[in-house]
């Protein structure tokens, strides 16, 4: 176990270290980081999306605690869901994808179970490939009367995969796992231009190294800014609590 990583981004958050007897009287809301296990080029770890979602969730939980009144329930960070729909990366070793349908069912059953004792559920998503499953699961949970929503770890103008954006954030939250001697620019074409080839052959069809963007420009300072933007956006969406038709917090 990488102790430095776990000091920065605990895999077990407050929910994981709580006891069952502590929960019935609190009726907490929970933040569930949702990531993936997939290639992130030659320089970032397979759990990059999970690290980011967990770090954002941790920071959001802290911020939400500061907004509570005495009569409001608290927010707990759940242990992350570290597997998602990553079929576009399947050509690369290390990728483990459970597919959109399996993920949808997992999230649906997770939400049904957690809603038995939790107030609100927020999935904090760190991987774009999970969106289809999230939409289907959270839409169903809300149709069943459960107060669920989801938010993405997004940044305006960010590149697509293992490039400047994700590498900068990792340099901020987990610098020890970034292999800076292996940084190499990938395909930086706009995602819209790449989509036809991506759909046919996955990421390997457009980037042999698995990078979409340019990680060579990444810095920890930029990562701090991007990370703060992700946290601010998620906090604002939760505070407004206006889920759209697909359950995404707007």
Curated annotation (Swiss-Prot):
A biological process term (GO) from this entry: proteolysis
Task: State the similarity comment.
Answer: Belongs to the creatininase superfamily.
Q: Which gene encodes it?
A: mftE
Question: What does the UniProt record say this protein does?
Answer: Peptidase involved in the biosynthesis of the enzyme cofactor mycofactocin (MFT). Catalyzes cleavage of the MftC-modified MftA peptide to liberate its final two residues, which consist of a cross-linked valine-decarboxylated tyrosine dipeptide (named 3-amino-5-[(4-hydroxyphenyl)methyl]-4,4-dimethyl-2-pyrrolidin-2-one or ADHP).
EC code: 3.4.14.14
EC class (word): hydrolase
The cofactor note reads: MftE appears to bind one Fe(2+) and one Zn(2+) ion per subunit. Fe(2+) seems to be catalytically active while Zn(2+) could play an auxiliary role.
Binding-site residues for a divalent metal cation 1, renumbered to this chain: 38, 49, 127
Q: What is this protein called?
A: Mycofactocin precursor peptide peptidase
Q: Which UniProt keywords apply?
A: Hydrolase, Iron, Manganese, Metal-binding, Protease, Zinc
Cofactor entry: Fe(2+); Zn(2+)
| Molecular function GO terms recorded | hydrolase activity, acting on carbon-nitrogen (but not peptide) bonds, in linear amides; metal ion binding; peptidase activity
Reactions catalysed, as given in the entry: [mycofactocin precursor peptide]-C-terminal glycyl-N-{5-[(4-hydroxyphenyl)methyl]-4,4-dimethyl-2-oxopyrrolidin-3-yl}acetamide + H2O = [mycofactocin precursor peptide]-C-terminal glycine + 3-amino-5-[(4-hydroxyphenyl)methyl]-4,4-dimethyl-2-pyrrolidin-2-one
Organism, scientific name: Mycobacterium ulcerans (strain Agy99)
Assembly: Homooctamer.
